[in-house]
Amino acid sequence: KCPDISSGRLNPTNSEYVIKNLDFGIDACMKSKDLGLVTGPISKENIVEGGYSFSGHTERIMEKTNSDDVLMLLASERLKVALATTHMPLNKVSESVTTDLIINKVKILNQELKSKFNIEKPKISLLGLNPHAGEGGKLGKEEIEIIIPAVKELIASNVDVSMPLSADTAFNKNLLDETDAYFAMYHDQGLPVLKALSFGDSINITLGVPIVRTSVDHGVALDIAGKGIANNRSEEHTSE
């Protein structure tokens, strides 16, 4: 039986339906390499209220495909931004950013830029965690103790990645033109810039998993549901 649907209103009883359809799509793609998964926006809050432990599509795909690691990449024609951490409270980010995490995820990004985007020698601009990238340890020690050791190991592995950059100036035009992808430490560090430049024209791509998955760059937008004013450009780009 189809769950009750009211335009513009969340219903936690729909959570099971949403999760089952997502899992069905993941399983189908695992069985056939000719298939890809395109997902629409869902309310994480609504899924959790429906009784599921759920932090996002990306994390669910990682779990269902038994992948060791996964990387969220938002991409448009102008800009690509990958995330070290995804959907977590800001006060958890610092403890979650480790040297191994950075190494693993930047290696995924480097490899997938080559294989999926045909970039022979990707140039990655990596953002620091703290304001001014820690300013020599005066505004935080994470750059010195965690991030720079990761970058040094990546460079030794022939990955073209920058030392941690101050996020407030890293998206200047000159660097933007020279960068194939940015690596941000948390969700709201890199994505506001991408969405300011390309909102509605960018897509979400899951890297590091054995299936192709793309998604729109926006949320459920309940405030405009049923009004006929939604912009579907991002949805069109997900299938290109």
Task: List the predicted regions and their residue ranges.
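Short beta-strand elements at the ligand-binding edges of bilobed clamshell
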Residues: 73, 81, 88-97, 229
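Active-site glycine-rich loop that binds ribose-phosphate moieties when present
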Residues: 60-68, 88-114
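Short, basic/glycine-rich phosphate-binding loops at helix/coil junctions
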Residues: 1-7, 81-89
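Contiguous, glycine/small-aliphatic-enriched amphipathic segments in soluble metabolic enzymes
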Residues: 1-57, 100-185, 189-197, 201-204, ...
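Glycine/threonine-rich beta-strand-loop-alpha-helix active-site module
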Residues: 49-71
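Short, flexible loop segments at boundaries between secondary-structure elements
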Residues: 64-79, 209-223
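Short, structured patches in soluble enzyme cores that scaffold and shape functional sites
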Residues: 77, 85-88, 128-130
